[in-house]
Amino acid sequence: MHNHTWKLVDLPLGNKPLGCKWILKKNMKPDGTIDKYKARLVAKGFKQKEDLDFFDTYSPVTRITSIRVLIAIVALHNFEIHQMDVKTTFLNGELEEIYMEQPKGFGAPRQEKKVCKLIKSLYWLKQAPKQWHEKFDKVMLSNDFKINECDKCVYTKNTQTEYAIVCLYVDDMLIIGSNNDVIKATKKMLTNYFDMKDMGVADVILGIKIAKTSSGLILSQCHYIEKILKRFNQYDDSPIKTPVDLNLHLAKNNGPTIDQLEYSRIIGSLMYVLNCTRPNIAYAVNKLSRFTNNLEKDH
């Protein structure tokens, strides 16, 4: 209600409202401690019918390579890099005519039979990501930012003396500026349009920790790596100096099958690490990924 996401109306003839539910979750800090508890109302978008309730759903996100290039630019030119988070991201997108049942626990006196007409997008709607990205594009273009041709989630604005870059990954945002005044102006502009959380100097983005030193910037994923080690019960294993044993010969499994899904999850987690900060494990991960369909205990 605070975001004017919906209003109560009588259900028009011939329309069927979508259901909704509350999702309860914990937001975690980079060090693994609890930041806050969150309750989010979501629509049961899985009941939507294509070409009737929605049409396009695609929404891009920035590439990890783009984030690394931008961080390299910051280090090279000694720019400022800050971070912001968009609160209730998908609630900013504007919608066509969609109706939803009243949320559980919401009671409007003498209006129990009415339904919610969605004014803005809601989480779990099929078109929610696309609507949000279109809205963000309009805001950035109207404020003289240009969309990068190689990455549609990178926005640039430059004059003869100042330079600003905004990099968007759904609701996480890196703001880069040639000086603090540019950063402040960009933050103020975004706050005028969206409900933003200012996170100050960039610290952690997508599990990548950014540490500033006297000689530049250091990227690491210590917390993320510890998290996946605990997830796959490998946290107590002893570290080794090289990522692969040269004397180990791997072969396809011709015996009993082993949990392929768990193995694929491990490979996927390791691939994210090597793409972000640890290219030194590329050979080992590439070699292990060849046996996804024919694995044994040695793998």
Residue ranges and their predicted role:
Residues 1-299:
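Long, low-complexity, charge-biased intrinsically disordered regions
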